[in-house]
Amino acid sequence: EKAITCFRHAMSFDLPYTRLPHPKYKGKRIPAFDMIKFSVNLHRGCFGGCAFCTISAHQGKFIVSRSKESILREVKAITEMPDFKGYLSDLGGPSANMYAMKGDDPKKCRKCKRPSCIHPKVCPNLNTDHRPLLDIYHAVDALPGIKKSFIGSGVRYDLLLHESKDPAINRAAREYTRELI
């Protein structure tokens, strides 16, 4: 069932959206739209479990990530928009750096009752690898028509500072931090 939900979510991004405000606005400027006009949503969900936030309540605790191919198709479509100048305002999601992160053992995740996978400490079952996200960033930045992409979504620094038992994951977190700066 979860695989079907993930598939439906991924497919929903490939529908023929216009990327324009509702016609009822008839050419009026919408400041909030200006901010997201050239942004790309990479995933849904958040495992932060913050008491003040409702993201996990309406998007879920488990991250559902889009495929690299789907993301690149959307970015290519943006580059063909008449007023696109080469700058993506956001490659992100509810928390930008949770893309493709999940528990190593899904059975443990399904049984878990913790509201947060990262507080008060990062769950040892959580794979905090930033390499899939770095791969997306590099692929997007290499596309013709892209001058620069930004991360406008919130970043969980606790994930960047977390020391994994895997040195490659720690290197990827440092590389991601350099990418942000």
What are these regions (language model features)?
Residues 13, 47, 54, 72-79, ...:
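Short, well-ordered alpha-helical packing segments
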Residues 16, 42-46, 54, 92-95, ...:
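Short, flexible loop/turn elements at secondary-structure junctions
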Residues 77-181:
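Conserved SAM/AdoMet-binding glycine-rich loop
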Residues 1-36:
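Flexible, acidic/Gly-rich N-terminal and inter-domain linker regions that tether
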Residues 68-72, 130-133:
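Amphipathic alpha-helical segments in well-structured domains
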Residues 5, 19, 47-49, 59-62, ...:
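Flexible loop/turn segments at secondary-structure boundaries
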Residues 53-70:
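Iron-sulfur (Fe-S) cluster-binding segments and ferredoxin-like electron-carrier domains
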Residues 27-54, 72, 84-87, 181:
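N-terminal pre-triad scaffold of radical SAM enzymes
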